[in-house]
UniProtKB/Swiss-Prot annotation:
The gene is ndk. It comes from Nostoc punctiforme (strain ATCC 29133 / PCC 73102). Belongs to the NDK family. Homotetramer. This is Nucleoside diphosphate kinase. GO terms for cellular component: cytoplasm. It comes from the Bacteria. The active site is at 115 (pros-phosphohistidine intermediate). Its EC number is 2.7.4.6. PANTHER family: NUCLEOSIDE DIPHOSPHATE KINASE (PTHR11349). Pfam families: NDK (PF00334). Transmembrane segments: none annotated. GO terms for biological process: CTP biosynthetic process; GTP biosynthetic process; UTP biosynthetic process. The keyword Ribonucleoprotein does not apply. ATP binds at residues 9, 57, 85, 91, 102, 112.
């Protein structure tokens, strides 16, 4: 079963949107297998956003993600990476479709509420960076047979 990494960023936590964001993935039928509420260290932030190290916004990105707690999550389900990206919406909330998290709640590109893995390979790397194996729970909700063929 495919897994993805999602993180509700400091703006999503501060605005009280954690429950609403989690609800969207639960009602879609995905299974939550890992959840942490944490203050991100500078080291973790720099590792996570390492691909942007040479970009001019890298410093402000690290500063923002370490400014307040985040909710780190691992979700599981068929096609969860691509589906999560659709639920989240475009990176820039101003171009995100209504009905997406960013389209409904996002304010600007620097405060876009949530991070989601962009590919299955990236998801595996991000999950390994943020979670130890023993922090992930292998379980199946009773409704699973009603969601999958």
């Amino acid at each position: 079963m495919e897994r993805t990494f999602l993180a509700i960023k400091p703006d999503g936590v501060q605005r009280g949107l954690v429950g609403e964001i989690i609800r969207r993935f639960e009602t879609k039928g995905f299974t939550l297998v890992g959840l942490k509420f944490l203050k991100v260290s500078k080291e973790l932030a720099e590792q996570h956003y390492g691909v942007h190290r040479e970009r001019p916004f890298f410093g402000s990105l690290v500063e923002f993600i370490t400014s307040s707690p985040v909710v780190a999550m691992v979700w599981e389900g068929d096609g969860v990476v691509a589906s999560a990206r659709k639920i989240i919406g475009a990176t820039n909330p101003l171009t995100s479709e209504p009905g997406t998290i960013r389209g409904d709640f996002g304010i600007n590109i620097g405060r876009n509420l949530i991070h989601g893995s962009d590919a299955p390979e990236t998801a595996q790397q991000e999950i390994a960076l943020w979670f130890k194996d023993e922090e992930l729970v292998n379980w199946q909700p009773h409704i699973t047979p009603w969601l999958h063929e």
